[in-house]
Amino acid sequence: MRTVAHVHGARVGPNDDGWPEDAFAPGHSLLYHYPNAQDAATLWYHDHAMGITRLNIYAGLYGAYLLRDPEEQALALPDGEHELPLILCDRLIARDGQLYYPVSDDPAAPWVSEAYGNATLCNGKLYPFIEVEPRRYRLRLINAANARHYELSLSSRRPFVQIGSDQGLLPAPLERMRVELYPAERADAVVDFSGL
């Protein structure tokens, strides 16, 4: 299956952006140059191959791409095991447990551009669980869904402190009870789990 590497939100030259026709096939390679010469940000990479991007991403060709800079490091944000990239997506899981992507019965329009699943995955897992310590965590939130948007809130009724969005840190932290993410959108937030 052919693929194209694209880092969503990266500032790169046109030859390295992973345009849809710049595909390579299994057994071959292509060298991209990512200078990472931009502010700290939560980006994500995904396939971008013409006509099959939706299928390759549906199959799991995506991931977090985190940029850092001195300004961000000076903020002493939670890091290491206390920094969690969380990539959300929905998938349609058939009765036999296999992934299913809807197909069009219209030969003039073979693509199904918007597909909604019956299950939400986080980092490729159904119903993931992580035990947290009573401290602050940094959540790098990414919506890798085809069409679904998410409205996230915490059952503990604690706020998110949003510190970043698609292209990096916000001018000032923003306390929010809910974070909304539309397809390909990112948010960077800190949550304090102390006292739970």
Predicted segments with their positions:
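Extracytoplasmic
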Residues: 29, 60-62, 81-83, 115, ...
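Conserved, well-structured core segments that form or line functional sites
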Residues: 86-108
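Histidine- and aromatic-rich segments of cupredoxin/plastocyanin-like copper-binding domains
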Residues: 12-20, 100-196
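Short, structured patches in soluble enzyme cores that scaffold and shape functional sites
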Residues: 36, 49, 69, 88-90, ...
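Residues in well-ordered beta-strands of folded domains
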Residues: 6, 66, 87-89, 121, ...
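Extracellular/periplasmic metallocenter environments
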Residues: 1-73, 175-196
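Low-complexity, Pro/Ser/Thr- and charge-rich linker/hinge segments at domain boundaries
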Residues: 68-84
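Short helix/loop capping segments that flank catalytic or ligand/cofactor-binding pockets
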Residues: 15-16, 55-56, 75-76, 94-97, ...
